[in-house]
Design a protein with these regions (language model features):
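Short beta->alpha connector loops at strand-helix junctions that form conserved
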Residues: 72-73, 113, 139-140, 162, ...
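Active-site/ligand-binding-proximal alpha/beta "capping" segment
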Residues: 183-233, 237
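RNA substrate-binding interface of SAM-dependent RNA methyltransferases
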Residues: 44, 97, 102-189
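Boundary-proximal intrinsically disordered activation/regulatory segments immediately upstream
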Residues: 1-57, 142-143
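Glycine/small-residue-rich loop that forms an oxyanion/phosphate-binding "nest" at active or ligand-binding sites
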Residues: 67-94
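Short acidic-hydrophobic, aromatic-tinged amphipathic segments that line or gate anion-handling sites
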Residues: 3-6, 70-73, 161-169
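Active-site regions of enzymes building and remodeling cell-envelope glycoconjugates
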Residues: 63-74, 107, 200-203, 222-225
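Structured adenosyl-cofactor binding patch, chiefly the S-adenosyl-L-methionine
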Residues: 91, 130-131, 145-158, 215-251
Length: 251
């Protein structure tokens, strides 16, 4: 295993940039994850690892050939970790091909419209994985699904679930071509209860907590749906609302 003791080493600088910049992640074609448990998930699901950095004293797992393995002292790990308290392991993963498919052949898709909190996006991806959602689309400046915070919140779902980033027009053209209706979680004259919606084959859009669905996405929804809840409550957290919708599509 390679040993690095300098914070100014080129790899350490590269890792800090992966942590800080979405544009840098895209340009370099890889993203950063942290934690021993997440590394175990990445190995379990054959994620395309590029580099693994471990703190001194952390046992190295069996790594695929071609993966660069590095050990660093505690002070260097603190300088590159996205966590205030480092978890002992950092690793980089090759970004997946996120080009839109020619056709959607699945039955259930989720659309996130302007959901900007990384923790919410990560939790939603984790829930989408649990309920066998066929794909998640991110439109209108959602949080980066490949930031360290988002990836951590997915608990490994980022390694095995399709996530597409596209414009609203690209999304709607693909849904139309695939003969998939788009429903929006919002109130409108045509709003129906989630329990009564026909979700056997559909895409459902969830908006941000502060603004809800954008006018752009709302105008493209064939119908809108609402989650039945106590009149005392006005709305749900975006991740909670997505979880309820995903469960309803799954069951």
């Amino acid at each position: 295993m390679e040993h690095i003791t300098s914070r100014q080493n080129a790899l350490m600088t590269h890792i800090r940039k992966l942590n800080a910049s979405r544009a840098y992640r895209r340009a370099s074609g890889e993203y950063l994850c942290d934690g021993v448990k997440l590394l175990e998930e990445a190995l379990r699901w054959n994620a395309p690892l590029k580099t693994v950095v471990l703190s001194e004293g952390v046992d190295a797992p069996a790594l695929p050939s071609g993966v660069r393995a590095v050990q660093v002292p505690a002070d260097v790990m603190r300088s590159i970790s996205p966590m205030e308290t480092p978890q002992g392991a950092l690793f980089t993963v090759r970004l997946p091909d996120t080009a839109l498919p020619e056709m959607l052949t699945g039955a259930h898709y989720l659309v996130l419209d302007g959901v900007q909190d990384p923790g919410n996006v990560g939790t939603i991806l984790r829930t989408a994985d649990a309920f066998d959602c066929d794909g998640v689309f991110l439109v209108n400046a959602c949080a980066d699904p490949y930031s360290p915070k988002t990836a951590r919140a997915t608990m490994g779902a980022v390694f095995r679930r399709d996530v597409y980033q596209c414009t609203a027009d690209e999304l709607c053209a693909l849904l139309q071509k695939s003969n998939l209706p788009l429903y929006g979680a919002a109130l409108r004259n045509d709003t129906v209860s989630l329990r009564d919606a026909e979700l056997s084959r559909a895409a459902v859009a969830i908006g941000s907590e502060g603004r809800g669905l954008s006018a752009e996405i709302l105008s493209k929804c064939e119908k809108t749906i609402k989650i039945p809840m106590s009149p005392r409550c006005e709305s749900l957290n975006a991740a909670v609302a997505a979880s309820v919708v995903l469960w309803e599509m799954y069951r």
